[in-house]
Design a protein with these regions (language model features):
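Solvent-exposed, polar/charged alpha-helical surfaces in well-ordered, non-transmembrane soluble domains
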Residues: 48, 52, 56-59, 85, ...
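Sec/Tat signal peptide C-region and signal peptidase I cleavage site
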Residues: 23-28
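Bacterial N-terminal signal peptides
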Residues: 10-22
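Gly/Gly-Pro-rich "capping" loops immediately C-terminal to redox-active cysteine motifs
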Residues: 47, 66-99, 120-127
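Signal that preferentially marks extracellular ectodomain short beta-strand elements
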Residues: 42-46
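N-terminal secretory signal peptides that target proteins for export/translocation
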Residues: 1-8
């Protein structure tokens, strides 16, 4: 079993918390900067990688192209209201009936909404396929929310050495 990444989780969680704590100050200074880059209709490789990771972990609930489903919201709409640090916090800690946190189990206990349906977003802090690429996933979802890219697989620029 490949569990080497678990040894690094305390450090990664600490870094994630530091990121979440520092993002409001950073985002206030850089409101015009986008987490994605598009040149001649092609996205940067990080955003393309976010598309790939989104379809590996997120599309089952949030639908293809982040449009939502009958049991999970459209990320296109959500990211028009959420700041980046809020999005990261929800993905890392999960959400149960609107409350962030508490869904940190691999199989969280579902609460029941007034309609009798559970409303749970699991925490992904244990999933290296999400945690290691969270910035890329956010970049893809934000590009979709901003309508900067169309539905479907986005064409991408070549991978840069720094990516």
């Amino acid at each position: 079993m490949h569990l080497k990444w678990i040894a690094y989780m305390p450090m990664r969680l600490g870094m994630a918390l530091l990121l979440v704590a520092s993002v409001p100050a950073v985002s206030a200074e850089t409101d015009d900067e986008k987490p994605y880059r598009i040149v001649d209709g092609k996205v940067d490789f990080g955003t393309y990688n976010g598309y790939r990771r989104y379809h590996n972990s997120c599309h089952r609930c949030h639908g293809p192209d982040a449009v939502g489903s009958s049991f999970a919201p459209s990320l296109i709409e959500s990211l028009r209201k959420l700041e980046e640090f809020q999005f990261l916090n929800i993905v890392i800690h999960g959400r149960i009936d609107g409350r962030i946190g508490g869904a940190d189990d691999d199989q969280p206990i579902a609460s029941t909404s007034a309609a009798g349906e559970s409303n749970v977003m699991p925490a992904f802090y244990k999933d290296p396929n999400v945690m290691e690429y969270l910035d890329d996933i956010y970049a893809y979802a934000k590009a979709r929310s901003d309508r900067a890219i169309a539905p479907g697989r986005p064409p991408h620029l070549p991978k840069e050495k720094s990516d």
